[in-house]
Amino acid sequence: MKSKTFLEKNFINVQAYKYNGDLYRQWNGSKIIKNDSQNIILYNFHSRIMEKSGKSWQVSEPSLWIFPKNENYNVNVLLRPEGNYYYINLTSPFIFEDNTIKYIDFDIDIKVYPKKEIEIVDIKEFQKNIKDYGYPPSVRKMVYKQVQNLLMFYEKQTSFFHRDFIDNIVNSLAKNKMLVFQSKKLSNFSQRYFEELRKNTKNEKIFKVYLCGPTVYDEVHIGNMRSVVVVDLIVRAQKYLGKKTLFVHNITDIDDKIIERSIQSKISENKISEKYFREYKKVLKKYRIKSIDKMPKVTDNIDSIVKFINSLDKKGYVIQKDDGFVFDVSKIKNYGKRLSREDKKQVENFYLWKSTTKGVQYNYNGFLGRPGWHSECTLFIDDIFNSQTLDIHAGGIDLTFPHHENENAQYIAKNDVKITKHWLHVGQVMFKNQKMSKSLGNVILAKDFDEDIFKIILINSSVTAPIYITNELIENAKVIINKYKKLYFKFLNLSLSFNFDDNVRYMVRKIADKDFSSFNLKLNEYIKAYNTSLEADKLTIVSSVIHFLNFSFIEQIEKDFRKNKKIYDIWQGFLKQKNYEKADMFRKILIDQGLI
């Protein structure tokens, strides 16, 4: 099917078959709402279902049906304000013909209930049909493997289980008036759905993290990446220790730098910001940043920012000037208390909204302009975290003042609470004895730097201290990576299993506590203990921690393991035969990959 964007006009049918080719169920009139490179997503309401027996009925509540392309499952999501209900079918990859999605149902299913209970169902039917339909070993193996993958998605809350995946679709349905129903049972559906969502978010004991994000006008360098890699480690550590987390990382997609770039290049602000936002997402993928839950953009939230500034105005914190509106810092008790003497000299009211004649403009009470930088972040925190205090607010150390001080002032003004329990001001990355900066021209682009080397450098540094990038530092990181590779390959070679005992949890807790020094000390103790004793339990602890750190080399080692295991066994075989010449040939292959 031709790729299209959200809210397509056509309706299609769906047919489910048994393995012997019998059609046993059909859905008529499912609306395509999304068709991209990954999924076809259908919206079902009043669709007609027909059974092989002749029985038929109409869908009476809204649901989504997700068909991942080239996967062995599809997902039916019943949308309910009290919580969504997932029904996952294990199937063949679907085909599309005659305006119909067609697939073979392998009977075994997974249910996920609104309170997050998960259940594998119809196992007996699957086992019966192995005999009745003669499922070959390849089908049985595929089904069991897919069940494990889906359970992993659920455990990590990734893919369609991610908190934003369904809610973003529901939000688009609501905006397009597709969740307005005549039925009394479904009255005010979208309002109830999102009220319940906000209530659940507020009531849950969630570890709440916000990290100031980039202005997307150029490619990011490794200095920009330090904060996000550090915070990703901390958030994943909290997840590992059993905490639910909400990690928000904003995107500034309109500001003076973007407008200047637009004027210089004669390309619209939107095209520039979209281009570099795409580039940033590629870099996040390269650096294996997967813990971010929301990435709100300024241009998508102008109306909310306007309402936020109005709320401050009603409380008497806004002063109107000829060129915009400023926040009255004199009304905030202890404003600037944490500042240095030099910073205190620079304390002044700051713009919430500033008039401008250059670039894209928005309207605030008759003033054409743009929101202030400090208001954007404060609004996102207030809106997404339901006016609660964060557990960690992170950013570069250069944002301490005025940005973070001004965010906190606005939050106190609106909500009478501090914006965060803990500030995390990550140290700068220095190159050629200066702060890495585009204006100085001393940058190393993140896309050009090895992500594993960078992570090693960060883990072996204090979170708040500056890092000086040198050839010696990079070479030292390579030595550590090679050591980790050899240990991890040995772990796989011995067919050991990951360990989640107190020793591993202790080290992960040190990452969660931002105590990277103690983490390294303990990890190196276990590496030394293994090298001395060669005890499998020590290697298991070390490898479990290395796996937690989520290096790129892990994926490559696991991908090539079967091939390299054969090479390893051949090498060992020649050693036993004392055929050292041939043994050295195979040993060299493993050495070249850094595996032994």
UniProtKB/Swiss-Prot annotation:
GO biological process, one term: cysteinyl-tRNA aminoacylation
Family (UniProt): Belongs to the class-I aminoacyl-tRNA synthetase family.
The organism of origin for this protein: Mycoplasmopsis pulmonis (strain UAB CTIP) (Mycoplasma pulmonis)
Cofactor stoichiometry and binding remark: Binds 1 zinc ion per subunit.
InterPro entries: Cys-tRNA/MSH_ligase, DUF402, FomD-like_sf, Rossmann-like_a/b/a_fold, tRNA-synt_1_cat_dom
Pfam families: DUF402, tRNA-synt_1e
The protein, known as: Cysteine--tRNA ligase
Assembly and interaction partners: Monomer.
Catalytic activity: tRNA(Cys) + L-cysteine + ATP = L-cysteinyl-tRNA(Cys) + AMP + diphosphate
Lineage of origin: Bacteria, Bacillati, Mycoplasmatota, Mycoplasmoidales, Metamycoplasmataceae
